[in-house]
A protein has these predicted regions:
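Membrane-interfacial amphipathic/re-entrant helices at transmembrane-helix boundaries
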Residues: 1-23, 51, 59-66, 92-96, ...
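Alpha-helical transmembrane segments within multi-pass membrane transporters and channels
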Residues: 60-104, 111, 245-250, 281-282
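Membrane-embedded helix boundary and interhelical linker motif in transport proteins
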Residues: 11, 33-80, 84, 260
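Transmembrane alpha-helical segments in multi-pass inner-membrane proteins
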Residues: 20-22, 60-72, 192-202, 206-274
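Hydrophobic core segments of alpha-helical transmembrane domains in multi-pass membrane transport
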Residues: 49-53, 71-77, 104-111, 149-158, ...
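Transmembrane helix-bundle core of multi-pass membrane transporters
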Residues: 89-163, 190, 256, 261, ...
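Helix-loop-helix "hairpin" substructures at the membrane interface of multi-pass membrane proteins
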Residues: 16, 138-216, 240-246
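Glycine-rich phosphate-binding loops of nucleotide-dependent enzymes
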Residues: 36-39, 74, 136, 171, ...
Length: 294
């Protein structure tokens, strides 16, 4: 029975994993450039879902315009959070920045609870759903859309990082921010751009997950945010392809856990696999062990 369901569950896992991958990319970019775990990232994903919800429901935008609008709003939100919450603490201890990140996370969650309530809302289905059958595998047009959008955004991110002037600045700052500043790179602008870029991907993921599961609520970012962080660590935090790979691995693990009747333990299985991977490869699947000079 399990092997009959395996192809379908792999497809479902890849779709879910593509959303985790988008989220994980935000974590890994921010960590790569300033060594900060931005635990508010999952809540930016939640904000993206709500921006998409109101853009479609209240502003009567179509799905594609709402998706871009959500990405823009979340990019601005990410840059503002970096400027107000993280920049003043850049020379402080890492624990100070970590506590601030957790505080920003709770602030975003409960300000949304205050303004929109804690109830779950149905995300508007602005795209008519069709199902395609390929042998024993069933795939909807919405699933295909999610996968294609996620892959396009991942490729676009890679092109930005590798081919653009700002991308080169990001890589320079991640290696040595002091040397980058001496070379004329505006470190503050580069870090703000990194937050904005990662947050825009989180906003896109929020809209896609709303379309996929047809429901959103103010606390929806907590668990996916942690899983995306796990995905980033699993693949090798600070490494963009590693974060994407980790996202797909987490998505497939979750759906396979459900397929074998262990849906109640799927989170435990994900974290268990993370522990095993880190025991075997402490830097993650694609990470490299680097000795830190003291």
């Amino acid at each position: 029975m399990f092997f009959e369901q395996l192809p379908q569950q792999l497809v479902n896992g890849i779709i879910l994993g593509s959303i985790y991958a988008l989220l994980a990319l935000g974590y890994t970019m921010v960590y790569g450039i300033i060594k900060l775990i931005n635990f508010a990232h999952g809540d930016i994903y939640m904000m993206g879902a709500f921006v998409g919800y109101y853009a479609i429901n209240s502003l009567k935008m179509n799905f594609w315009i709402a998706l871009v609008f959500s990405m823009i709003v979340c990019a601005i939100l990410g840059a503002v959070i970096e400027f107000l919450a993280y920049r003043p603490l850049r020379n402080s201890t890492r624990i100070s920045a970590l506590i601030t990140a957790i505080g920003v996370s709770f602030f975003l969650e409960y300000i949304m609870v205050y303004f929109v309530g804690a109830d779950t809302r149905s995300f508007p289905q602005s795209i008519k759903m069709y199902t395609y059958h390929f042998g024993s595998i069933s795939v909807t047009n919405v699933q295909l859309l999610i996968l294609v959008v996620a892959l396009v955004l991942m490729v676009a991110l890679q092109l930005i990082v590798k081919k653009t002037k700002m991308g080169k600045a990001m890589r320079a700052v991640s290696v040595d921010s002091d040397a980058a500043e001496l070379m004329g790179i505006n470190v503050n602008n580069t870090i703000s751009f990194t937050f904005a870029l990662g947050s825009s991907l989180a906003g896109a993921a929020g809209v896609l997950i709303g379309l996929y599961y047809n429901s959103i609520e103010p606390l929806m970012g907590m668990t996916p945010g942690i899983k995306a962080f796990v995905a980033a660590v699993l693949g090798g935090i600070g490494i963009i392809p590693g974060a994407a790979l980790g996202g797909f691995v987490i998505g497939i693990l979750e759906t396979l856990s459900t397929a074998i009747g262990l849906s109640s333990y799927r989170d435990a299985i994900v974290y268990g696999v993370l522990i095993v991977i880190l025991l075997l490869r402490p830097a993650g699947i694609l990470g490299k062990n680097v000795k830190e000079k003291v």
